[in-house]
């Protein structure tokens, strides 16, 4: 026998609870690039243009991962509604393998073809060197960024929306601190300029990824991962 249908207000409330963390995550992810652009402003217009030109191709690549993550959130939420914890964990394992493989391919292609990608984005000769260097360093940290986003998407599916905010806020704070230290060479750190901004970004995303991984290694969490789990693909 089926239970009573939820009211319209409850439907909108549930939809909002699922949607706003995803929207907030997108804003925080884009904020990293904006912060980099602002903080290299002291280096001159060439540095600003070099960093700004990389944002569009980076988000084109991220859009593929985020499209996968929409499905991850939906399937994990469905498995939890069915009281199928193992099914939810299996979905996360499969999603992580796909996310890792896809991110590895995309980051490798992005690194190898950074120069033509920047040319297509409109980079002029005077900004080409800095934009290619920045984009290649960002691609080196693309895999942990995508792994973290996929885990966060699965956590949203089981109602744990706090992890997305925590990891992305941490990423932005670390990026901000190391931008200050590495762009202009403060407090004994080397002056790396545009490359320093890129290194700060991947450092922040790597720490965020580690926090996301830690969230699924806890014994008291709904989504738990272990090396001993079955990580193979199946038809189910």
Feature locations, PLM:
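Short alpha-helical transmembrane segments in multi-pass integral membrane proteins
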Residues: 1-22, 76-143, 189-236
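Helix-terminus/linker motif at the lipid-water interface of multi-pass membrane proteins
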Residues: 31-49, 118-125, 181-192
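Small-residue-rich hydrophobic transmembrane alpha-helices
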Residues: 37, 48-111, 145-164
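Hydrophobic transmembrane alpha-helices of multi-pass small-molecule transporters
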Residues: 60-63, 175-179, 209-213
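Residue-level signal for short hydrophobic patches within transmembrane helices
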Residues: 12-31, 35, 57-64, 140, ...
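Short hydrophobic/small-residue motifs within alpha-helical transmembrane segments
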Residues: 142-146, 170
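Alpha-helical transmembrane segments of multi-pass membrane transporters/permeases
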Residues: 99, 154-181, 195-198
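Transmembrane alpha-helix boundary and packing residues in multipass membrane permease domains
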Residues: 22, 26, 37-38, 74, ...
């Amino acid at each position: 026998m089926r239970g009573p249908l939820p009211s319209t207000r409850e439907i909108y409330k549930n939809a909002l609870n699922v949607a706003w963390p995803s929207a907030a995550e997108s804003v925080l992810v884009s904020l990293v690039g904006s912060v980099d652009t602002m903080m290299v402003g002291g280096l001159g217009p060439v540095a600003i243009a070099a960093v700004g030109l990389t944002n569009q191709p980076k988000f084109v690549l991220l859009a593929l991962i985020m499209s996968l993550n929409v499905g991850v959130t939906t399937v994990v939420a469905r498995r939890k509604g069915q009281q199928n914890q193992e099914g939810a964990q299996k979905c996360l394992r499969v999603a992580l393998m796909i996310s890792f493989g896809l991110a590895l391919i995309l980051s490798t292609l992005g690194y190898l073809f950074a120069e033509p990608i920047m040319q297509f984005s409109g980079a002029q000769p005077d900004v080409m060197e800095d934009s290619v260097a920045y984009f290649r360093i960002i691609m080196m940290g693309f895999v942990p960024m995508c792994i973290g986003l996929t885990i966060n998407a699965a956590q949203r599916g089981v109602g744990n929306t706090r992890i997305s905010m925590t990891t992305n806020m941490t990423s932005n704070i670390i990026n901000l601190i190391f931008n200050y230290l590495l762009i202009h060479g403060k407090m004994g750190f080397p002056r790396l300029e545009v490359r320093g901004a890129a290194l700060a970004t991947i450092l922040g995303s790597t720490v965020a990824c580690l926090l996301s991984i830690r969230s699924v290694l806890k014994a008291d969490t709904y989504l738990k991962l272990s090396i001993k789990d079955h990580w193979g693909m199946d038809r189910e």
